[in-house]
Amino acid sequence: MTKEVKQLFGTDGVRGKANYEPMTVELSVLLGKAVAGVLQESKSGKHRVVVGKDTRLSGYMFENALVAGLTSMGIETLVLGPIPTPGVAFITRAYRADAGIMISASHNPYWDNGIKIFSSEGFKISDVIERRIEQMVALKEFGNFPDDCAVGKNKRVVDAMGRYIEFAKATFPRGRTLKGLKIVLDCAHGAAYKVAPSVFEELDAEVICYGCEPTGSNINDNCGALFPSVIQKAVIEHKADVGIALDGDGDRVIMVDEKGHIVDGDMILSICANDLKKKDLLRGNRVIATVMTNFGVLKYLESVGIEALISPVGDRHVLQNMLEYEVNLGGEQSGHMIFLDYNTTGDGIVSALQVLRIMIESESTLSDLTSLIVKSPQALINVAVKEKIPLDTLPLVQEALRDVRSSLGDSGRVLLRYSGTENICRVMVEGLKKHQVDSLAKTIADIVDSELGVGMVE
């Protein structure tokens, strides 16, 4: 009888509540063995794997479990400690490692954790490799186990943070500094809590830190990129030039201008795309945006001669489209920005540095840079759900969607989808008037909640 192969990977690796299926120590050991097995299938000889993590308390046990699985198969592991996800991608390349693993649940609460796997080139692994790993885990067939003298060694990389700090600074023009800029920085008590302040301070900015005291259980807790109100207030209070909010693993960024207004990923994409186009550095004068990208932002990009190619939501999908269409800039409203000229995955620190560079070079405030971008009124409501039942099988939900689309006509749109990483249904409505989109979004959200939900979430 053929054993069922259980799907472990979601849209961004394996993720779930720590110590519950699928995020258990036992599974992590098996995942370590499976990664080793895949590497040994691809080429013979010794292999090295980089392992990083964010600041969640459960990261310690998952780190040990993964290392145990990897080294039991003869893999040498290089443990980095707390470091942003883009730091793992960078160091995997810098050390010529065969793979990189990041232990993080990104923007999720502390009780969740996850495992993301990178190739030797620093890209997230393909669907094909994910399926092979799942197959090995299901069958518990990982290849040949080494004898006692051929198991792998585990080494701690003591200068991992320093290496990533220098890498991030190198994306800022040599000879320029951030002198004179006052920055409010929120690191979400996450993986960037040490490296991000160092990057901006070493470039001579005045940095006021929030969310830089991790306890293991306060990551993303009313702070960071999901809660920009923290830096909105702080920017005004400290009369700062700009606010920067990162998420728990440092791969996304939301900014705030000197007036306290939020500058999301859509606007960061627009600012950076226009700058690169002016310098003839935007490949094909195209960017990758997503189905969530604000219509007003798309109109702005078109007005400055930039074509936006639309991708499904998720930095993985954005990257796939960037590679397919040979585009060097892509991003999401949520703050995942990929600058392929610098890194192979979303990088919050590097993204913020590019915006700061543009501010300095153009002698502009952040509000100046966004002044020509007029966003369409948009409402986004997140509904926590018990399970992800296919939305097209829910008659009341489909009826509500038809009614809302009829109300909007050609002047707006509605998007209803499940999160790829959480039990959340996202309701997005866009139109001409703010009060209308708010009301229509709430109508749909209430019906989704009555059918599937456990309540609204922020």
From Swiss-Prot:
Alphabetical list of InterPro entries matching this protein: A-D-PHexomutase_a/b/a-I, A-D-PHexomutase_a/b/a-I/II/III, A-D-PHexomutase_a/b/a-II, A-D-PHexomutase_a/b/a-III, A-D-PHexomutase_C, A-D-PHexomutase_C_sf, A-D-PHexomutase_CS, Alpha-D-phosphohexomutase_SF
Classification via SUPFAM superfamilies: Phosphoglucomutase, C-terminal domain, Phosphoglucomutase, first 3 domains
Example of a GO biological process term: peptidoglycan biosynthetic process
Phosphoserine: modified positions: 106
HAMAP family hit by this protein: GlmM_B
PANTHER family attached to this UniProt entry: PHOSPHOGLUCOMUTASE (ALPHA-D-GLUCOSE-1,6-BISPHOSPHATE-DEPENDENT), PHOSPHOHEXOSE MUTASE
Protein name (record): Phosphoglucosamine mutase
Highest classification ranks of the organism: Bacteria, Pseudomonadati, Chlamydiota, Chlamydiia, Chlamydiales
Name of the gene: glmM
